[in-house]
Amino acid sequence: MGRFIFATLGLLLVAFSINGAKGCCCPHDWLTLKGFCYKVFNEHKTWNDAEMFCRKYKPGCHLASIHSGEESTDLAEYVSDYLKSGGNVWIGLNDPQKKRSWQWTDRSQNNFYPWKQGEPNNRANNENCVELWSPLGYKNWNDESCASTRAYLCKCRF
């Protein structure tokens, strides 16, 4: 009897391990990338409203942080495929104290800044949020007024 229970528990452990190895569980309409799930939402919101939407969608979700050229390229391709009509897209980088000190809403490290040429420029002293720039294929960033409305990219773990 003891061996049966031990064998059963062993099989359950193997089954759970295999399930977990799938990169578990992004919803079918989300992009899975390096352990995270990403989704573009095309309902235009201000930057603050977009961040709040991501947070309410699931605890731990935020507007997307981007940390490498590879991640940026993969997300640019995903966003381009999803938003056929174009339009810039909010990400989770902002300057909450308006001192040109950029921070991710998920509190991750700032280590990658593919600004489009001439950016960030803080035009009209009012650009404290960051968007993926559509005319350059979503691979570069632009600072923009947080009150502007845009599509947005959420990043979660499920």
Swiss-Prot record:
CDD domains reported for this sequence: CLECT_REG-1_like (cd03594)
GO cellular component: extracellular region
Motif Mannose-binding mapped to chain: 119-121
Keyword annotations of the record: Calcium, Disulfide bond, Lectin, Metal-binding, Secreted, Signal
Top-level division of the source organism's lineage: Eukaryota
Entry-linked InterPro entries: C-type_lectin-like (IPR001304), C-type_lectin-like/link_sf (IPR016186), C-type_lectin/snaclec_domain (IPR050111), C-type_lectin_CS (IPR018378), CTDL_fold (IPR016187)
SMART domains from the UniProt entry: CLECT (SM00034)
Signal peptide positions on this chain: 1-23
PROSITE patterns the record matches: C_TYPE_LECTIN_1 (PS00615), C_TYPE_LECTIN_2 (PS50041)
Annotated localization: Secreted
Pfam families in alphabetical order: Lectin_C (PF00059)
Disulphide-bonded residues: 26-37, 54-154, 129-146
Keyword Secreted: yes
Domain C-type lectin, chain residue ranges per copy: 33-155
Role according to the record: Mannose-binding lectin which recognizes specific carbohydrate structures and agglutinates a variety of animal cells by binding to cell-surface glycoproteins and glycolipids. May be a calcium-dependent lectin.
Family to which this protein belongs: Belongs to the true venom lectin family.
Name by which UniProt lists this protein: C-type lectin lectoxin-Thr1
Source taxonomy: Eukaryota, Metazoa, Chordata, Craniata, Vertebrata
